[in-house]
Amino acid sequence: MAKLHDYYKSSVVAELTKQFSYTSVMQVPRIEKITLNMGVGEAINDKKLLENAASDMATISGQKPLITKARKSVAGFKIREGYPIGCKVTLRGERMWDFLERLINIALPRVRDFRGVSAKSFDGRGNYSMGVREQIIFPEIDFDKVDRVRGLDITITTSAGTDEEGRALLAAFNFPFRK
């Protein structure tokens, strides 16, 4: 079992129960899933770019990504409905905890000029979204084999009802929020 999951069960639940005066352990917010999304707009011209992006995402997440297709045609971007334009992965369970641990302890500290992530990126319901500009911050990605530096979106979905509860949950995991 992931160390972060054990830490959640042993320390975080008790800490948040005390902080928010929950009457039941089931009221304590938990992380439900982590979604990784990579938009590859250039894939319209070159299908190989999307394959490489999907390969990078599979390496980062440990799971095969789903190829996302355009929902509607946009003439300005030369996109037709159904064109493959990105990929996404939804992590739950053991893989989710492993990814979160690697994100907090290894990947984010490797970002150049890292001062912390914004504490304002909550959606109003306790879910947190952030963007990473380079996929090479993850140690699984071999820098020499990367054809192009791509960014990805990371969404952490929690069962928290408010942003305050969601922020407290992530802060309990030592999530590096900007001061």
Swiss-Prot record:
InterPro entries: Ribosomal_uL5 (IPR002132), Ribosomal_uL5_bac-type (IPR020930), Ribosomal_uL5_C (IPR031309), Ribosomal_uL5_CS (IPR020929), Ribosomal_uL5_dom_sf (IPR022803), Ribosomal_uL5_N (IPR031310). One of its GO terms (biological process) is translation. One of its GO terms (cellular component) is ribonucleoprotein complex. The keyword tRNA-binding applies. It comes from the Bacteria. GO terms for molecular function: rRNA binding; structural constituent of ribosome; tRNA binding. SUPFAM superfamilies: RL5-like (SSF55282). Keywords: Ribonucleoprotein, Ribosomal protein, RNA-binding, rRNA-binding, tRNA-binding. This is one of the proteins that bind and probably mediate the attachment of the 5S RNA into the large ribosomal subunit, where it forms part of the central protuberance. In the 70S ribosome it contacts protein S13 of the 30S subunit (bridge B1b), connecting the 2 subunits; this bridge is implicated in subunit movement. Contacts the P site tRNA; the 5S rRNA and some of its associated proteins might help stabilize positioning of ribosome-bound tRNAs. Part of the 50S ribosomal subunit; part of the 5S rRNA/L5/L18/L25 subcomplex. Contacts the 5S rRNA and the P site tRNA. Forms a bridge to the 30S subunit in the 70S ribosome. Belongs to the universal ribosomal protein uL5 family. This is Large ribosomal subunit protein uL5.
